[in-house]
């Protein structure tokens, strides 16, 4: 045993230069297994640095080794542990999977430049007054006309009330004759009271008609903006989406569109009309009652507005905190529910609930601050308005005593101010919500201003390609996701039209990156990629992506029926074509066994289907797309061996006359490839056919092949050993049974 350990450690020391991070893990596992129990760390030691823990590990290994094997036999182990100390415990990644090395932004506009509020309003008004929609502009003009009529009727109402009070106050028989219906109607007081009612009804009528006419303008604007944002997000490059949480983006779009609706209503029907009505009331009071009334009114309104604006600005930060907490809570809930099975596997329901409750508590705290400060705002507004109204009433009373004003004038002044109080009470809410809506719209319009790094050249021609000309060529391609960490370092190869080429290599060697570059999710920093002899950067993205089909490693399906997900490969395909590709992918019979057949809902992200079924759906819809070039990114990774062989046979027929590139981990799936390209450290290390590469026993491919083959053989051997053990136990049981039977027979006494 000691000799075996010594040879193992000599081999490990000789392999220091080859993938250090892998061998460090191997050495650590070997040390722990040989030394009995591994090192135990206290809770404080777990938080220590990697180097500190490694030092503790090696010291523990020295002590344990000396105790168990003695100093002479542990020399090689000590040499190996010294080598371990010189290796970094955690190395920087040079590969890239998703957003490795960086967290997702929960704020959708994090790292983006804000858009000026004036530009937001200008952009929004361009949707309200579109040059290509004269019908919508006509609706806006009609709405403004009804708005003016409603405000005019509002001003008339207090005047009608004044004349009615003055008429009744004179108590003249000619002015008020209630002896019969005609005389009652004919009296001035009654006519004025009827006019009062008509004015109020007219104001309400104009307001409601205005809302009905303008409704189409507002909803059309919201729809167009939301559609443009949605389309723009789809046009952004993959790097943007990998750095943003989908839940946060969804909430940003939702809040932004709701904000547009509110701002449109607030600007057109609240803020501007309030200003207009304030000026109109002040002018009427100046003309009818004098400058003092106008000054008190303007002073009250000015103080009211200034107080509202100041307090609302201060309160806005609480709303921002609420939004952030709402975003975090929403993201946590979505993330947890999407990982429902993982939560169950680790019994972490309470942990997830506590985590979610933490975000809700933050939201609750900010919400309480917002509610309490709102009470302060409302009280301050009422106090200012009450002081102004009292001052106006005192002035009116003095005017009545002096004979300059009538009782009707006092009622008119009171009515005018109270009419202003309604929109003024709403002013605080309108201003607060408008500011919040502008914040939400800022996020929305900031997203619209984001420029994609992957775009067409001006007047880029479509890709000219046929299955006979679909050659793929990489020419000295250099690429890195993070500056200074090269993923591809001068990769060059060519895939002839109609040929099947496999790309293999270790994890992080750049296999999947080739798929992303060929689909133009990213651009290489150096070098060129050609398809059908045309540089990818010179042709339109739409034509390029129509010509390339991709079967991803992780197939994600839409929350819809199986038929919908299959049809997504070509939305114009007939049902017969959909059924044909399902049969080709070995999926048709499995679908027919489902309760609803092709109308079966697959669940969110396809969670109701098994991994193999999802993979077959992805393969089927890629076949339905019928592109000249197909990329398989470990497309059979989720399949069992029997299904894998069935699908591989089907795929051989599919790719027979088209260019195909297989990104493979299991080498057995690409044995029949016309050429196999082996990537190592971002470069093409080897290339050739399966048997040609195996002929070189020292090649990377040969080593990978034998490693995988030995693993399969070991699994088979373990299965055979278990079977033999089971058989030997059965034979032993039978032998024991025979001995018991024979002993009974030899005794001759049945009582035995």
Swiss-Prot record:
GO terms for cellular component: mitochondrial inner membrane; mitochondrion. Pfam families: ABC_membrane (PF00664), ABC_tran (PF00005). Residues 42-55 have a biased composition (Low complexity). The modification Phosphotyrosine is found at residue 340. It is a multi-pass membrane protein. The modification Phosphoserine is found at residue 336. Residues 23-140, 207-259, 312-382, 431-752 are mitochondrial matrix. InterPro entries: AAA+_ATPase, ABC1_TM_dom, ABC1_TM_sf, ABC_transporter-like_ATP-bd, ABC_transporter-like_CS, P-loop_NTPase, Type_1_exporter. One of its GO terms (molecular function) is ABC-type iron-sulfur cluster transporter activity. Belongs to the ABC transporter superfamily. ABCB family. Heavy Metal importer (TC 3.A.1.210) subfamily. This is Iron-sulfur clusters transporter ABCB7, mitochondrial.
């Amino acid at each position: 045993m000691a000799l075996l350990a010594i040879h193992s450690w000599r081999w490990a020391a000789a392999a220091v230069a080859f993938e250090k991070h892998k061998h460090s893990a191997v050495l650590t596992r070997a040390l722990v297994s040989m030394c009995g129990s591994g090192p135990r760390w206290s809770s404080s030691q777990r938080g220590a640095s990697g180097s500190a823990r490694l030092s503790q590990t090696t010291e523990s290994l020295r002590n344990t080794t000396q105790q168990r094997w003695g100093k002479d036999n542990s020399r090689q182990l000590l040499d190996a542990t010294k080598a371990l100390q010189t290796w970094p415990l955690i190395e920087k990644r040079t590969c890239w999977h998703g957003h490795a090395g960086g967290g997702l932004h929960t704020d959708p506009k994090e790292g983006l430049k804000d858009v000026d509020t004036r530009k937001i309003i200008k952009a929004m008004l361009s949707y309200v007054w579109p040059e290509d929609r004269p019908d919508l502009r006509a609706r806006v003009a009609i709405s403004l006309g009804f708005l003016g009529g409603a405000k005019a009727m509002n001003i008339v109402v207090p005047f009608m009330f004044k004349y009615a009070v003055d008429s009744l106050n004179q108590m003249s028989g000619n002015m008020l004759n209630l002896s019969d219906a005609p005389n009652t109607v004919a009296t001035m007081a009654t006519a004025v009271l009827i006019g009062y009612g008509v004015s109020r009804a007219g104001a309400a009528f104009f307001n409601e008609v205005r809302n009905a006419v303008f409704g189409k303008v507002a909803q059309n604007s919201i729809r167009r903006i939301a559609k443009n944002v949605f389309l723009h997000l789809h046009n952004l490059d993959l790097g943007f989406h990998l750095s943003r949480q989908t839940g946060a983006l969804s909430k940003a779009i939702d809040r932004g569109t709701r904000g547009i609706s509110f701002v449109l209503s607030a600007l057109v029907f609240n803020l501007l009309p309030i200003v207009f009505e304030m000026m109109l009331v002040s002018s009427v009071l100046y003309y009818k009652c004098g400058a003092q009334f106008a000054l008190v009114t303007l002073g009250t309104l000015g103080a009211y507005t200034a107080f509202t604006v100041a307090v609302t600005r201060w309160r806005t930060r609480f709303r921002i905190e609420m939004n952030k907490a709402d975003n975090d809570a929403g993201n946590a809930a979505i993330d947890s529910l999407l990982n429902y099975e993982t939560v169950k596997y680790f019994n972490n329901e309470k942990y997830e609930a506590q985590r979610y409750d933490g975000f809700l508590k933050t939201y609750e705290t900010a919400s309480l601050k917002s509610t309490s400060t709102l009470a302060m705002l409302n009280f301050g507004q009422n106090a200012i308005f009450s002081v102004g109204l009292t001052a106006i009433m005192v002035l009116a009373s003095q005017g009545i005593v002096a004979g300059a004003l009538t009782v009707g004038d006092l009622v008119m002044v009171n009515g005018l101010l109270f009419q202003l109080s309604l929109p003024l009470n709403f002013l605080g809410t309108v201003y607060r919500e408008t500011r919040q809506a502008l914040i939400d719209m800022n996020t929305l319009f900031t997203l619209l201003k984001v420029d994609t790094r992957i775009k067409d050249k001006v007047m880029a021609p479509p890709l000219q390609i046929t299955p006979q000309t679909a050659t793929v060529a990489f020419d000295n391609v250099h690429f890195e996701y993070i500056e200074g960490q090269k993923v591809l370092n001068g990769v060059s190869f060519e895939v002839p039209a109609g040929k099947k080429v496999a790309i293999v290599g270790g994890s992080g060697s750049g296999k999947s990156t080739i798929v992303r570059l060929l689909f133009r999710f990213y651009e290489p920093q150096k070098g060129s990629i050609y398809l059908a002899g045309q540089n990818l950067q010179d042709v339109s993205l739409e034509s390029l992506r129509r010509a390339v089909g991709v079967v991803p490693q992780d197939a994600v399906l839409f929350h819809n029926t199986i038929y919908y997900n299959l049809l997504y490969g070509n939305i114009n395909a007939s049902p017969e074509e959909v059924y044909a590709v399902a049969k080709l992918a070995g999926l048709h019979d499995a679908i027919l066994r489902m309760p609803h057949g092709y109308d079966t809902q697959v669940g969110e992200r396809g969670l109701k289907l098994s991994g193999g079924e999802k993979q077959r759906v992805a393969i089927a819809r890629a076949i339905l797309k019928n592109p000249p070039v197909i990329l398989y990114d470990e497309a059979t990774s989720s399949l069992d061996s029997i299904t894998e062989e069935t699908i591989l046979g089907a795929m051989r027929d599919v790719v027979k006359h088209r260019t195909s590139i297989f990104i493979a981990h299991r080498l057995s799936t690409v044995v029949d490839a016309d050429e196999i390209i082996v990537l190592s450290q971002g470069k093409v290390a080897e290339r050739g056919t399966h048997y040609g590469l195996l002929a070189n026993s020292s090649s990377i491919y040969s080593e990978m092949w034998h490693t995988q083959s030995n693993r399969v053989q070991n699994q088979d051997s373990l299965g055979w050993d278990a079977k033999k053990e089971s058989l030997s136990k059965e034979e032993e049981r039978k032998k024991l049974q025979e001995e018991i039977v024979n002993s009974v027979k030899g005794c001759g006494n049945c009582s035995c």
